[in-house]
Amino acid sequence: MEVGVRAALGLSLTGMSGLSLISPAWFQSLSSSYGIFTYCSWPPGDCWNQSCVTFGSLKDMPSLAWKVSAATLLGGWLLLSISALLLSAWALAPRRLFARTGFGPTPVVQAAAAVSMLVGLLVFPATLASPFAKEICEGSSMYHSGACRLSWGYATAILNMVLTSLLVIRWQVTTVQRAAVPFSSETQRAILVPE
């Protein structure tokens, strides 16, 4: 059952990470926003009429920091996808095929995914020094957002990275010895009995 729960968590984290990667809402100003792969702009006061552009390749991205961040974040997402698929196969495979004594290589793959995503998330704010970001976020510089503010896409990516790193931990399952606790009918409180 634990493998099934980990597989479900891995698949949901993969989906959430994918959504945050394609989100254009990592840094946002009053009339535009951008993410790792997408940029959107809109007329002031009319945020429902957005025009969005996707960076087609690494060549289209404005700076080296942007390219490094995109490559490491996408690599982390691919590793997370692989680990989720491995865990799903592990959970759905017949028990007679192999003994389920561990999780195989998935903790290592998940740890590599978490490290890759961490590197990408730490490098991404350096994109604020690019001419593209300076045009959107007036007064921005490396690790200073200027007129922009962090938005939900970047926060979701950080949360996904933290949850992925927690997924690596194999929680120790302990068996609790059950004992009857006597109750007093007068006070209706538990009486502690030393062993």
UniProtKB/Swiss-Prot annotation:
Gene Ontology, cellular component aspect: membrane
InterPro entries (UniProt xref): LHFPL
Top-rank lineage group of the source organism: Eukaryota
Pfam families for the chain: L_HMGIC_fpl
Membrane topology, record value: Multi-pass membrane protein
Keyword Cell division: no
Alphabetical UniProt keywords: Membrane, Transmembrane, Transmembrane helix
TM stretches of this protein: 7-27, 73-93, 108-128, 149-169
Subcellular compartments: Membrane
UniProt family annotation: Belongs to the TMEM211 family.
Name the record gives this protein: LHFPL tetraspan subfamily member 7 protein
Lineage: Eukaryota, Metazoa, Chordata, Craniata, Vertebrata
